[in-house]
């Protein structure tokens, strides 16, 4: 990141009824340690809540953390809610227990990348840095 760019703004969301958030909290800390501005939604977010938070926080990246197995039903609804908020330029990534057989289908929906358990945090940070939409720094 150069001095002419603002820090990357990331929203980490826990959609659906998934009540396990340790991995999401570890990721939030890693992204913050890497110099990113991170908003964590907390548990039990609806697709509309995720999209509204992404719009209100003016994020460049939305990370969806899911362990419940409901990714095939939740992800399309979240992507549609983001489109309704006119957030077509936001990078959407996902992580959690997404079976390898579902990864191609999830990416086909519009999820840019899927990070499964065991993915090194440095790899996630590097991916976000390389793919987040660039925004100019706010004038002083």
Regions found by a protein language model. Give the residues of each.
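N-terminal pre-triad scaffold of radical SAM enzymes
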Residues: 13-17
